[in-house]
């Protein structure tokens, strides 16, 4: 009886803990020569996916954080897992007027 109850508790708690550990996924669109949204706040462990919906190639480049997506051709995506807290300003290396901020809490 005790063993069955323990297994039931583990099965109820483990999926929740696993989902929390994996973090959430957030989307940033690249369109109209902008990052949309331009500012996004995420938690440590969350994933941010930038998808290029523009007709030009773009990048996600944060020099201070040493983050670089490489060139993203139209319709391509890039994933980044936020591991360090703080503010990460970034630009498109190909079009430096395009700016965004990733805030990791």
Task: Annotate each language-model stretch with its function.
Residues 2, 10, 17-105:
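Extracytoplasmic copper-binding redox domains, predominantly the cupredoxin/blue-copper superfamily
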């Amino acid at each position: 009886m005790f063993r069955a109850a323990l297994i039931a508790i583990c099965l109820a708690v483990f999926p929740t803990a696993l989902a929390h550990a994996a973090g959430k996924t957030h989307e940033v669109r690249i369109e109209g020569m902008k990052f949309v949204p331009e500012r996004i706040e995420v938690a440590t462990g969350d994933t941010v996916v930038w998808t290029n919906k523009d007709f030009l190639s773009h990048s996600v480049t944060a020099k201070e954080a040493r983050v670089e997506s490489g060139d993203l051709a139209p319709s391509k995506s890039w994933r980044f897992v936020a591991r360090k807290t703080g503010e990460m300003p970034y630009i498109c290396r190909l079009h430096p007027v395009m700016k965004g901020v990733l805030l990791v809490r």
